[in-house]
Each structure stands twice: as structure tokens, then as C-alpha cells.
A protein has these predicted regions:
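Hydrophobic alpha-helical transmembrane segments and adjacent short intramembrane/lumenal linkers
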Residues: 191, 205-206, 211-214, 218-225, ...
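Membrane-interface helix caps and helix-loop-helix hairpins in membrane proteins
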Residues: 225-231
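Alpha-helical transmembrane segments
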Residues: 4-10, 147, 151, 205-209, ...
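Membrane-embedded alpha-helical core segments of multi-pass
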Residues: 152, 156, 185-189, 210, ...
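Cytosolic juxtamembrane amphipathic/interface segments immediately preceding
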Residues: 133-138, 188-201
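Perimembrane topogenic segments of multi-pass inner/organellar membrane proteins
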Residues: 2-3, 19-174
Length: 365
């Protein structure tokens, strides 16, 4: 029992330390060439580190700095479509030239502020009056950090559920990983699907509800690692999940569901006319709220923890280091709860929308 408790505490400490290690490593890279960037204050450097962590990128940055030539990173595939031609190379190619320009089939591309632009051989970037890049951009199908991480989570889910199914085929009594997964599956079924959708219809929605629950939870947990993966802190990911829920809801809608939207029964005719645009607007507000809720909560968690870690470097003393590290450890434990809670809430609301779409109303007039 003591070994299990120690393992659990070590697990929590590892997650907490991962944040501090990641932030201190990136800040250390900035500090290493501080003499070359005297014009930048420590707050400006910290802001750059935060932006680097929160934004998507074309590689996994591990440690080091591009400016000093010490950067170590895991490159990802760059896939571009430009003027009828497909261009393919690894993201590391951008950092092998002095101006970060890559030549492919007679065209030149440059990675600038996490976006790829067409340039000349010198990598010239043109700007407008507001200092925004005006170069043409190819159609980018690249495997970015978020895309790679999403695929990785999908593979892990396939392996996880495949292993559970294999164990159940051999022995109906849950053992090993199946023993861990069964309570979570029952949680989704008995606490989310059945109460919100109903005994009659819940089974056809269970595959999606289980998938979205475990995907969000696992993505959020991976976001606690020092790799800087922030899957559900990317609004494109949360929008995709919300749209799937939206389309499943609309395609599952029965006659009563559409009747309550376009011609609300049981109310005066004038009120029906007033309620119709409100109900139609509600169709799109629901997925929008799903998207923003998940995105904002996860993004805010990353920002808060990185901000607290940054205070260590701003104050620059041992007392601040101990105090803020302790606070970071506490907030990291809270983030583990938030990771699960956001998966639960998204799944719960999705089931609630499905239930409203398939519900049959007994109206008596």
C-alpha cells in the first residue's frame, strides 16, 4: 500500500516538475544568448516562451535555441501544394539554411512565425503598413505538432481498446488494463448516456461518447507532459469535436425535435413565430459553447501555470523558487482533475444534445 502511495505521489510530482522543467529549459535557452538580445526584457522573453508553447508548430522543440545553433528538435513532415505541384520535405530543412529558406522543385519556401510563405532564393519577406507578411502562401497539409499528437492519441486509443477487447474475449472477468477501463466505460454508460439519452436509444451513441471522452481525457493528460503538446488548447481541434457532435445531433433529430425548433407546440401562434429564430440560433450556439468551453479552460490552465513559473525568473531568488514551485505543484494536481472534468463535461453535454434530438414528446392539446 505504501509503495502504491509513493508511486502516486511520484506521478503527481513528475507532472508538476514537467511544467517547471519545460519552462526553465526554454527560458534557459533565452538566457543563454541574453547578451545578444539585450534590448529584450525578461518579461518579453517570457512572453515569447509562452507564445512558443501555446502555438502550434512544425516540429517538437526539445531544448536549445535556433539563434545559437544549439536547438534539438524532432522534425515533422512538411507537405505543401503550390501551383499544381506537391512539395514534401522535413521541417528540419528550414533550419539547415542561414535564412531558413528551403528550395523544392524550383520554388522557395520560408518558415516565418510558424507559417510557411513563398519567397525568393534569399528568403525575402515583404510587409504591409501594419508589418504583416504579404508573401503568397502555399496550401499547407503539413503534419504539425497538434496533428501528430492527435494521430498519436488515436493510435493509443485503438491499442488501448483493442487490448481491452482481447482480454474480454479470453476472460469475461476484467483483469489488468480492462480492470482499469471498465469503471470508466460504466461511468459513461450509466452516468452520462442512459440518463440523458434514454434506455431505448443510448446504445447507438455509446461508441462516439466513449471515443470523445477518452480522446479528450488522454489529450489533456498528454498536455501535462514537458513536450509542450496542447491539443485541446487548439481551437481547430475543439471546433472539429463540436462539429461532430452538432452533425450527429441534427442527423439523429426526430420529428418532435424539428417541430420544437420551427413550430413550437403548446404555445400561442405569435409566440411560435418569436421562438423560431431563437431556437434556430440555439442550434449553432450549442456547438459554439462546446468549442469555446473546452478550448478556453485548457488554454487558461496552461497560461496560468506558465505565468506562475515565469515569476520564478522575474523575482530571481530562492524563496520565490520554492514558493512558486510549490504553487505550481498544487495547480498541476488541479489540472489533472480539470483534464478529466473537461472530458466529462463535453461528453455529458453531447449526450444531452443527443437526448433532446431523439426524445419523443407526448403532447396533448
Amino acid at each position: 500500500m505504501q509503495i502504491k502511495r509513493f508511486g502516486f505521489l511520484a506521478f503527481l510530482l513528475a507532472f508538476s516538475f514537467s511544467w517547471a522543467a519545460n519552462a526553465s529549459n526554454q527560458h534557459g535557452d533565452e538566457h543563454g544568448h541574453h547578451e545578444e538580445q539585450d534590448e529584450k526584457s525578461i518579461k518579453e522573453q517570457i512572453a515569447e516562451v509562452k507564445e512558443h508553447h501555446l502555438k502550434d508548430s512544425h516540429s517538437f522543440h526539445l531544448w536549445g535555441d535556433h539563434a545559437s545553433g544549439t536547438s534539438v528538435e524532432f522534425p515533422l513532415p512538411i507537405i505543401l501544394w503550390d501551383e499544381g505541384e506537391l512539395h514534401f520535405f522535413m521541417s528540419s530543412a528550414f533550419h539547415h539554411s542561414e535564412n531558413q529558406t528551403v528550395e523544392s522543385k524550383g520554388s522557395y519556401f520560408r518558415l516565418y512565425h510558424s507559417k510557411i510563405y513563398k519567397t525568393d532564393a534569399e528568403g525575402t519577406i515583404h510587409y504591409d503598413e501594419e508589418h504583416h507578411a504579404t508573401n503568397a502562401k502555399p496550401i499547407d497539409f503539413s503534419i504539425t505538432k497538434t496533428v501528430f499528437s492527435t494521430i498519436l492519441v488515436g493510435i493509443l486509443l485503438l491499442w488501448l481498446f483493442g487490448a481491452v477487447a482481447k482480454k474480454y474475449r479470453k476472460d469475461p472477468v476484467p483483469r489488468g488494463i480492462a480492470k482499469f477501463m471498465e469503471p470508466l466505460v460504466i461511468l459513461v454508460r450509466d452516468d452520462i448516456a442512459k440518463p440523458n439519452i434514454g434506455e431505448k436509444d443510448y446504445k447507438r451513441f455509446m461508441p462516439y461518447l466513449l471515443t470523445v471522452f477518452f480522446f479528450i481525457w488522454m489529450a489533456n493528460m498528454i498536455g501535462q507532459t514537458p513536450l509542450g503538446i496542447n491539443i485541446t488548447g487548439n481551437i481547430a481541434v475543439t471546433m472539429g469535436l463540436a462539429l461532430i457532435t452538432f452533425f450527429l445531433t441534427q442527423f439523429s433529430g426526430r420529428k418532435d425535435y424539428w417541430a420544437h425548433i420551427f413550430w413550437m407546440p403548446g404555445v400561442p401562434y405569435l409566440m411560435r413565430v418569436i421562438l423560431m429564430p431563437i431556437e434556430i440560433l440555439g442550434l449553432f450556439v450549442k456547438p459554439f459553447s462546446l468549442m469555446i468551453r473546452l478550448y478556453a479552460n485548457i488554454l487558461a490552465g496552461h497560461v496560468v501555470i506558465m505565468s506562475i513559473i515565469s515569476l520564478i525568473f522575474i523575482f530571481g531568488n530562492w524563496f520565490a523558487t520554492g514558493a512558486f514551485f510549490g504553487l505550481t505543484f498544487f495547480l498541476s494536481i488541479i489540472e489533472l482533475l480539470v483534464a478529466f472534468l473537461q472530458a466529462y463535461i463535453f461528453t455529458m453535454l453531447s449526450a444531452l444534445y443527443f437526448g433532446s434530438a431523439v426524445e419523443v414528446h407526448d403532447e396533448h392539446h
